[in-house]
């Protein structure tokens, strides 16, 4: 085995090279990355190498051989697959690693994200739903020093930025959201999809699932006339049709 | 194998420790417990031990090693996984075991439950649908002494309680529904999800599936203008658009 | 192996005892027979024995051991599982075998069937859709003597009967539809589901899939304002919103 | 093994005979080819033989033995399965091979295609969505000489032709779209489904997935009042209900 291939071959299903492939397949069946859309990057917590899904590959058929591996210090590719180009998302993934201390980033073309970007203005908002408690608040518990989640009574706010012709052109707006929304773990790109990150791939996956659930729910609420961030007990007066 | 691990290791796919994992995976793919939401508890009919899914775990990846086991008499944990905390639902599960003689409890973040909780007031109601016959009526057949199901002409009523910041705060309202709805096998928590129980895990699973089917159908009926509990033959006069 | 068990044990995946289980599992994941709803019966073309799914079983977990086997001549059970009762649908299945020369019958609680039964009156109608060509017309090709399918320009009509408290009470209305719709291969039961039959289980499965596809499409058309049986080119004038 | 069977037996999962079966099964579970609808044809890049799915087969159960193989020069069948007839789509597939230099053609009964054909006139249009970038523009990069994809700011246009009683009657309209839309990789057939082709089966699959995603999105946009080809920033003024 070449020294490059050692980087991607492991019997451990939780090795980044294996996990990216498993999750891309799972996300494909969620309609999140059909037609080669979307992607995942994971930082190996042992080596600090970045593992990156390539551009243009069918996400449900991806294998570890298809992955790029990058050194986090030099930003040089330690391994490049012969058949593929690096994903155009790579600069965005690097920004999340460098500015948000991310351990993994998930990018999908979720239709829920695209629809929310058409309905909402500059910010997706939903409040008072149990699933919000899966999302980090950005605050730290003063006693345990652990990161605190949003509470049921909080409003989840996710910034929405405009899409550009090429993904690397999103970088300025991405950096701006890092400043304007220092606690967000996600950015919606209008008419495009969503980027979600977390300190580990497990966390990023949980955040992404919870946010997609909340976007799906927000669309259903909107279609029934209920503002997704309306107060508890206010739903009925917004309903387009009388409560049964 | 330690004495604690004996509790969770079995070759029998119907052993509670295995069944909780199998069903959590199945429910994950139903969008009922993504983002670590939801949970299941089963009472082992042989030992009367309670098996409980932990807090914060990805439900489709759960293994028997992740489970808590509790003694039904002392309410002490016979086994605690190192990595996880007990679910905040535990007091609610215990209430169902103790007050409703449950053999298993299923908790999901089903979007159908959340949407029904936004549209309905204090009670979910649906009538005159065949699937209602899967739900117990609370009555006992005077001849066979077996529990009787609802009939096609009955109205299924499920109480809806308000959500709180923490799940253990739901306990008072849960006890109140036990009094006000002595025959119910489920409680919807507004903007949160649903709890469903039964004398066995098989029954609880069937009740949960049937109720979710009925909530999904009720939402579709509501969206077309038909009150889900309207009389047979009354549908057409409620339709928003003329019958084709 | 007992003589009764010989009836249900076969290595052939197309043996009726195996095929009923495979299809029930597949239909469960289509949301057609959750909560123990629905069922399948197949006539073994070699023995003329009827294989019948039992009442109350979780359809995705069913095994050949759970099946009833009935002699087509004597209508006596050649095999009865210890744990289950015969399905209440059995008299309806027998009527399809005896009056329609069916080789298999599929019964589902498809929500598309229930919704169509709420929107349509006594007859489901859809016209001018390619998938209609999967449904038999009841006519025979004068040259090849083979059964002919509906054409693209035909209107598929499926009778809708009222539900009763118990499934065996549907028998009179079922017989009436056999007379009024001599060419139909399906009957919708209002607020309940659908029965579909065919000369073989393969045909019954294809008819059921095509009809469910057409009911799903009809609901979408209805929701956009288009009568599902409207003429080709008439769609646009029915649209609730202007064509984009 | 007979010389005919050599054509369809291979251990390579990417051999056309294996790939057609794998993809038909995958597409069946997408609701794209239930009830025997739809089909796939692949040209073997090594032999130039056409592999064709037969008529009337259950697409999720298809095996290599069910396939037709045709010589691209003589258009004679090198292999015909005993049980099946050639698909009525065969002349349409041949037209795509001969006039569009296709390497593979996918035909589905996608409900998204049928609904779009009911809502749109002679052309499906969607603009300014990231997923559009998966579709070829028909232009060639002047430097790299590689085919260029549509850009985010482009409008994807897919012609819609009228359905006929028999699929071979579509041939004239198909040829007309080849002239009127020289760059299209797909044709929607009203009230029927869609044909999508590409230089390889991998490309055809990616195009088909991306187009289905875009048709699904267009229907959702239309239902909310947003013209799928409206300008960026114009969405809000089209919304049926106010932005939340």
From Swiss-Prot, chains A, B, C, D:
GO MF terms held by the record: methylthioribulose 1-phosphate dehydratase activity; zinc ion binding
Cofactor requirements of the protein: Zn(2+)
Keywords: Amino-acid biosynthesis, Cytoplasm, Lyase, Metal-binding, Methionine biosynthesis, Zinc
Enzyme nomenclature, EC number: 4.2.1.109
Disulfide bonds, paired cysteine numbers: none
Pathway(s) annotated for this protein in UniProt: Amino-acid biosynthesis; L-methionine biosynthesis via salvage pathway; L-methionine from S-methyl-5-thio-alpha-D-ribose 1-phosphate: step 2/6
GO terms classed as biological process: L-methionine salvage from methylthioadenosine
GO CC annotation, single: cytoplasm
Reaction it catalyzes: 5-(methylsulfanyl)-D-ribulose 1-phosphate = 5-methylsulfanyl-2,3-dioxopentyl phosphate + H2O
SUPFAM superfamilies: AraD/HMP-PK domain-like (SSF53639)
Cofactor note text: Binds 1 zinc ion per subunit.
Active site, UniProt feature: 130 (proton donor/acceptor)
Function: Catalyzes the dehydration of methylthioribulose-1-phosphate (MTRu-1-P) into 2,3-diketo-5-methylthiopentyl-1-phosphate (DK-MTP-1-P).
Name of the featured protein: Methylthioribulose-1-phosphate dehydratase
Organism annotation: Saccharomyces cerevisiae (strain RM11-1a)
Organism lineage string: Eukaryota, Fungi, Dikarya, Ascomycota, Saccharomycotina
């Amino acid at each position: 085995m070449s020294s490059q291939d050692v980087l991607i071959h492991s019997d451990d299903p939780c090795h980044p090279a294996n996990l990216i492939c498993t999750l891309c397949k799972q996300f494909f069946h969620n309609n999140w990355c059909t037609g080669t859309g979307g992607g995942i990057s994971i930082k190996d917590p042992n080596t600090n190498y970045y593992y990156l899904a390539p551009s243009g590959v069918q996400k449900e058929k991806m294998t570890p051989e298809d992955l790029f591996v990058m050194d986090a210090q030099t930003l040089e590719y330690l391994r490049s697959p012969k058949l593929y180009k690096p994903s155009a998302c790579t600069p965005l993934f690097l920004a999340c690693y460098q500015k948000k201390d991310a351990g993994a980033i998930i990018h999908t073309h979720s239709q829920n994200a695209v629809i929310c970007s058409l309905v909402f203005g500059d910010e997706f908002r939903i409040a008072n739903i149990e699933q919000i408690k899966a999302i980090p608040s950005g605050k730290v518990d003063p006693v345990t020093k652990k990161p605190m989640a949003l509470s049921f009574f909080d409003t989840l706010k996710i910034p929405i930025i405009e899409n550009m012709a090429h993904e690397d052109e999103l970088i300025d707006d991405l950096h701006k959201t890092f400043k304007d929304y220092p606690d967000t773990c996600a950015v919606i790109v209008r008419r495009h999809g969503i980027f979600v990150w977390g300190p580990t791939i497990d966390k990023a996956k949980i955040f992404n699932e919870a946010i997609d659930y909340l976007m799906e729910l927000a669309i259903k609420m909107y279609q029934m006339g209920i503002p997704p961030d309306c107060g508890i007990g206010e739903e009925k007066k917004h309903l387009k049709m009388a409560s049964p």
